[in-house]
């Protein structure tokens, strides 16, 4: 076919002039890179071609190329590339959450960075690091927008991220303009998500839109609202995500659960005095109080405590009846005020724990502050209790650090982990942070509280406001004492009631205050410190906790992610008001990490263990930093402690060295806390954000070429690619030990299921077979009744071991066994020959040979076989006859009687010839004849018997009296013990008795 074409198009420079000067018909040229354009525009060509315009200008940047794809028909829209330097608009396959949308950056949904790309949504920042050789996404990094604590722009093209959960990262861009553009968008989101809670809910949070291409984050709100709206819509359409439970699966009222479980109805009651949050705005709607306290008493006593947080009962020891209470500091003031109603509430609660007739135990008041701090608060109408006003009271000061000291130590440990100095200074740097020391003090005081309760002392715990250190101490003590709170369901109720319902300021503790929104910074990782303390207990005693390490990590991440509504408010009151204004609902995290999710259930949990935890070493030397949370999820623990010069640097890295260069552009002023620390600790120093001093191109060879494969693998993620992102949109934590245990348990459960199905199939077939086959036609021989044929030497060895003195009294060896029978010889019970259960099968008495059932042959007698005592089955009739001691025969008469009986029995068996060396082939219908050992089987000389009497060799004629079982299995002679009568209960093993038939060997007197 001939194609009319125009002049050839030049698609690249080269020697020999322009390709357009050549003719299309010139097929002899080796350079076939030119592609002709057809003159007929409606003609469909079979190859791709490129139309280059503005080529004559001589500038590559101004030239444009139009790519016409395979089988192109003229008139189709072309693919145009203006410049080879222009970034392509492609999207990495990352599954978005319900309600999640990508925000365009410079009209691109995926923005290029050094070593990969990133994209931003209304929930998170996703960084994709790729392999340049294979263009494969090797690693994904996820940063929830609400988790960002600080975002800084650094010269030449860096963005530093500090996260509230403790991680720090540096993103490297190709140009400074790209870094500034992304920083502007992220900083707007940072401002929007750190507004005071009072200014957030003036409009509907669901109104976020990404249509504003200049800055799509100008109307951003917490993603939890958009996520909940999308999930509710999917639920109505029947398309709820499989990893989420329905909303009604989470109990709304949890106070009654503990009240009923602990049996508190006798002395306590649930009060609804705070139903509308009028008494205390930070307390839950329902509170447990003593029965002797009325609602009016609570209203009168609440103002005496700071913010109205009066003493409330939160737990009771079922063993000692001791009560655990919580409150805020009393309003004592300089004049030492007192309140009789407050004293009455405490007295009634303590009275319920005292047992009449026993010695009264002391009432312990644990003030989480130090004495100096508590005394200084008296100037602000605060203070501590006067023990003279409370019966048998004792006051203890715990000296735990306040939120500012906790925040300072957390910042120090975060900086230390991501900006390590020489390895020899590691322990010194860690000690300087004070983080592990604070953690140890918290665990020690919680253990002391648990010890008081276990000894029967009722305890009241409070600090200044009663929602930070108070919550930490009380919840840790409850975990140490009550096994229920160490389960997934119990730990969920503990968080929901003691932390969320009792008003821990979860939102304010993660809020970054800046600008004109307030001078006081209340952010502090109090909840994160509590989770790390629980992690230490779990690491010390892993079998006592039903939830896994991954469960705690997921809680820590979503406490700051903004995905779930569980941690977005300071109290129940704020959540209720926000939901009323927004007319929406929120998804709780418990719909995701409940006990229904096997990933968060410990496979080695000991569910039978009850009571308090075993003694735990809580000293500083036994603690370690929670690296899985504070550092990168996919870094191995060894990377943090490796030399800096051996660490690979990529497009998104952890800062490696500290720099004081002025190139760092701070987007917010450095933090400086100069307020008085009443606990006596030092001022909190301002934090300088670390930077990277070199660009990625300068460090491409930072990993030595001689590094082994094992060393290089330390820097690789455990899970490569998009599989590292979990269903909730954050990086998955891989617990290899739990994964292995889950696999083993699944295989075990599958094996049990298959065996159950097999048993059920056998039962079904047995029922069908019973209905089809008559009892007279059924013939079955148990495998236990079949024995392999032994040699003559072994038989003769058994014969030589016969000791007539030790034979059983009144024992009648049988030569004929009853054949197959459909019922028991005594109780006439029908047998099921296909049943796998011993109770439904037939058995033979090893004395008389009758066919009996399990119920009629529960007794056993003992014999000696090969020097070992073996239990044999006996029917009830034979067993009773064995107890007739008056019929006991002498050893000689027993031997004679046994021999004569054998001769008489053998003479009556069809086909048996005592004078012949051959086996008779006459087989009756109901009996199988005995088999006589032929003379050729004794080719080897018969060994001398190992008898004490040193008998001579057995004569040749003896072989005629060595008989075998009617079922063609050779019978061994039994040597019986002197004490043969032994009864075993029904639970003993009957398998041995089933498999060992009595082998009768009788010696003919010569």
Swiss-Prot record:
Compositionally biased intervals (Basic and acidic residues): 18-29, 933-954, 976-985
Bias kind Polar residues: ranges: 651-705
Binding site for a 1,2-diacyl-sn-glycero-3-phospho-(1D-myo-inositol-3,5-bisphosphate): 377, 402-403, 464-469, 505, 509
Residues the record lists as binding Zn(2+) 1: 824, 827, 853, 856
Catalytic activity: a 1,2-diacyl-sn-glycero-3-phospho-(1D-myo-inositol-3,5-bisphosphate) + H2O = a 1,2-diacyl-sn-glycero-3-phospho-(1D-myo-inositol-5-phosphate) + phosphate; a 1,2-diacyl-sn-glycero-3-phospho-(1D-myo-inositol-3-phosphate) + H2O = a 1,2-diacyl-sn-glycero-3-phospho-(1D-myo-inositol) + phosphate; 1,2-dihexadecanoyl-sn-glycero-3-phospho-(1D-myo-inositol-3-phosphate) + H2O = 1,2-dihexadecanoyl-sn-glycero-3-phospho-(1D-myo-inositol) + phosphate; 1,2-dihexadecanoyl-sn-glycero-3-phospho-(1D-myo-inositol-3,5-phosphate) + H2O = 1,2-dihexadecanoyl-sn-glycero-3-phospho-(1D-myo-inositol-5-phosphate) + phosphate
UniProt keyword list: Cytoplasm, Developmental protein, Hydrolase, Lipid metabolism, Lipid-binding, Membrane, Metal-binding, Zinc, Zinc-finger
Disulfide bonds: none
Binding of Zn(2+) 2, residues: 845, 848, 875, 878
Consequence recorded when altering residue 463 to S: Abolished phosphatase activity towards phosphatidylinositol 3-phosphate (PI3P) phosphatidylinositol 3,5-bisphosphate (PI35P)
Myotubularin phosphatase domain sequence ranges: 224-630
Effect of loss of the gene: Worms exhibit a 2-fold increase in PI3P, sluggish body movement with progressive deterioration and defects in gestation.
Ranges of biased composition (kind: Low complexity): 1-10, 890-901, 913-926
Sequence segments annotated as region (Disordered): 1-29, 641-705, 886-1006
Chief location bin: cytoplasm
Enzyme Commission number: 3.1.3.95
List of residues binding a 1,2-diacyl-sn-glycero-3-phospho-(1D-myo-inositol-3-phosphate): 377, 402-403, 464-469, 509
Location(s), subcellular: Cytoplasm; Membrane
Membrane topology: Peripheral membrane protein
Segments forming FYVE-type zinc fingers: 818-883
Function: Preferentially dephosphorylates phosphatidylinositol 3-phosphate (PI3P), and has some activity towards phosphatidylinositol 3,5-bisphosphate (PI35P). Positively regulates autophagy and is recruited to autophagosomes by PI3P where it catalyzes PI3P turnover to promote autophagosome maturation. Thought to have a role in maintenance of muscle function. Involved in locomotion and lifespan determination.
Record family assignment: Belongs to the protein-tyrosine phosphatase family. Non-receptor class myotubularin subfamily.
Domain topic, free-text comment: Interacts with phosphatidylinositol 3-phosphate (PI3P) via the FYVE-type domain.
Protein's name in the database: Phosphatidylinositol-3,5-bisphosphate 3-phosphatase MTMR3
Native species: Caenorhabditis elegans
């Amino acid at each position: 076919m001939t194609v009319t074409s125009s002049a050839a198009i030049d698609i690249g420079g080269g020697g020999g002039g322009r390709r357009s000067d050549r003719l299309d018909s010139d097929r002899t040229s080796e350079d076939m890179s030119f592609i002709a354009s057809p003159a007929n525009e409606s003609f469909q060509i079979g190859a791709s071609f490129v139309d280059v315009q503005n080529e004559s200008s001589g500038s590559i940047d101004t030239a444009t190329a139009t790519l016409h794809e395979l089988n192109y028909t003229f008139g189709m829209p072309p693919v145009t590339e203006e410049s080879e330097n222009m970034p392509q608009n492609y999207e990495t396959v990352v599954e978005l959450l319900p309600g999640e949308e990508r925000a365009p950056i410079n009209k691109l949904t995926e923005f290029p960075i050094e070593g990969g790309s990133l994209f931003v949504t209304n929930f998170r920042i996703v960084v994709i690091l790729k392999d340049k050789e294979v263009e494969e996404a090797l690693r994904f990094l996820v940063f929830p927008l609400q988790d960002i604590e600080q975002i800084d722009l650094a010269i030449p093209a860096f963005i530093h991220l500090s996260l509230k959960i403790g991680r720090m990262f540096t993103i490297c861009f190709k140009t400074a303009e790209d870094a500034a553009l992304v920083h502007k968008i992220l900083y707007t989101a940072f401002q929007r998500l750190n507004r005071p809670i009072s200014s957030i809910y003036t409009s509907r949070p669901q109104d976020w839109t990404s249509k504003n291409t200049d800055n799509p984050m100008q109307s951003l709100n917490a993603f939890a609202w958009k996520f909940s709206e999308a999930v509710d819509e999917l639920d109505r359409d029947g398309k709820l995500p499989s990893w989420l439970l329905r909303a009604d699966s989470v109990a709304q009222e949890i106070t009654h659960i503990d009240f009923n479980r602990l049996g508190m109805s006798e002395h306590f009651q649930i009060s609804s005095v705070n139903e509308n949050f009028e008494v205390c705005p930070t307390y839950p709607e329902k509170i447990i109080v003593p029965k002797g306290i009325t609602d009016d008493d609570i209203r009168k006593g609440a103002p005496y405590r700071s913010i109205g947080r009066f003493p409330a009962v939160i737990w009771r020891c079922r063993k000692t009846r001791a009560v655990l209470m919580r409150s805020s500091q009393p309003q004592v003031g300089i004049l030492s005020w007192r309140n009789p109603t407050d004293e009455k509430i405490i007295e009634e609660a303590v009275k319920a724990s005292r047992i009449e007739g026993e010695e009264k135990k002391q009432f312990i008041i644990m003030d989480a502050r130090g004495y100096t701090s508590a005394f200084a608060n008296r100037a602000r109408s605060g203070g501590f209790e006067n023990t003279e006003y409370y019966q048998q009271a004792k006051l203890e000061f715990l000296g735990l650090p306040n939120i500012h000291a906790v925040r300072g130590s957390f910042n120090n440990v975060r900086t230390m982990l991501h900006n390590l100095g020489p390895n020899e200074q590691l322990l010194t740097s860690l000690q300087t942070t004070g983080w592990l020391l604070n953690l140890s003090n918290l665990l020690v005081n919680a253990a002391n509280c648990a010890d008081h309760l276990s000894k029967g002392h009722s305890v009241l715990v409070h600090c200044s406001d009663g929602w930070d250190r108070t919550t930490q101490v009380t919840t840790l003590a409850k975990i140490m004492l009550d096994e229920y709170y160490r389960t997934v369901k119990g730990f969920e109720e503990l968080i929901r009631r003691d932390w969320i319902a009792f008003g821990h300021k979860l939102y304010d503790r993660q809020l970054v205050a800046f600008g004109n929104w307030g001078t006081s910074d209340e952010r502090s990782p109090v909840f994160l410190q509590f989770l790390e303390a629980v992690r230490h207990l779990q690491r010390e005693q892993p079998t006592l906790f039903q939830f896994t390490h991954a469960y705690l990590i997921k809680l820590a991440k979503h406490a700051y992610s903004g995905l779930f509504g569980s941690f977005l408010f300071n109290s129940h009151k704020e959540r209720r008001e926000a939901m009323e204004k927004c007319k929406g609902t929120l998804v709780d995290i418990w719909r995701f990490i409940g006990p229904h999710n096997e990933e968060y259930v410990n496979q080695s949990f000991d569910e039978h263990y009850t009571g308090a935890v075993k003694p735990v070493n809580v000293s500083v030397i036994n603690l370690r930093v929670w690296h899985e949370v504070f550092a990168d999820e996919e870094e191995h623990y060894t990377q943090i402690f490796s030399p800096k010069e051996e660490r690979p640097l990529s497009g998104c890295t952890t800062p490696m060295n500290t720099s004081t260069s002025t190139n760092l552009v701070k987007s917010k002023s450095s933090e400086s806390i100069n307020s008085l620390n009443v606990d006596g600790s030092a001022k909190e120093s301002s934090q300088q954000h670390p930077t990277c001093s070199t660009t990625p191109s300068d460090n491409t060879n930072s990993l030595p070429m001689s590094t082994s494969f094992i060393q290089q693998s330390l820097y690789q993620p455990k899970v490569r690619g998009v599989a590292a992102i979990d269903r909730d949109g954050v990086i998955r934590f891989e617990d290899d030990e739990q994964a292995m245990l889950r696999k083993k348990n699944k295989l075990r459960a599958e094996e049990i299921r298959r065996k159950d199905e097999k048993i059920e199939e056998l039962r079904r077939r047995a029922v069908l077979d019973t209905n089809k086959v008559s009892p007279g036609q059924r013939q079955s021989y148990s495998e236990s009744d079949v024995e392999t044929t032994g040699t003559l030497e072994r038989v003769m060895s058994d014969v030589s071991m016969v000791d007539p003195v030790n034979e059983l009294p009144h024992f009648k060896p049988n030569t004929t066994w009853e054949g197959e029978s459909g019922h028991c010889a005594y109780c006439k019970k029908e047998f099921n020959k296909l049943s796998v259960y011993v109770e439904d099968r037939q058995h033979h008495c090893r004395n008389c040979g009758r066919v009996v059932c399990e119920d009629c042959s529960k007794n056993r007698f003992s014999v000696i076989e090969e020097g070992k005592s073996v239990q044999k089955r006996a029917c009830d009739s034979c067993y009773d006859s064995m107890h007739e001691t008056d019929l006991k025969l002498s050893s000689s008469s027993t031997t004679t009687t046994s021999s004569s009986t054998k001769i008489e029995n053998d003479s009556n068996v069809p086909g048996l010839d005592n004078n012949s060396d051959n086996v008779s082939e006459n087989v009756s219908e109901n009996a199988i004849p005995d088999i006589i050992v032929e003379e050729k089987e004794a080719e080897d000389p018969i060994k001398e018997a190992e008898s004490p009497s040193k008998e001579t060799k057995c004569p040749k004629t003896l072989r005629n009296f060595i008989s075998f079982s009617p079922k063609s299995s050779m019978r061994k002679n039994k040597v019986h013990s002197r004490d043969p009568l032994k009864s075993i209960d029904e639970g003993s093993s009957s398998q041995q008795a089933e498999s060992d038939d009595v082998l009768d060997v009788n010696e003919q007197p010569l």
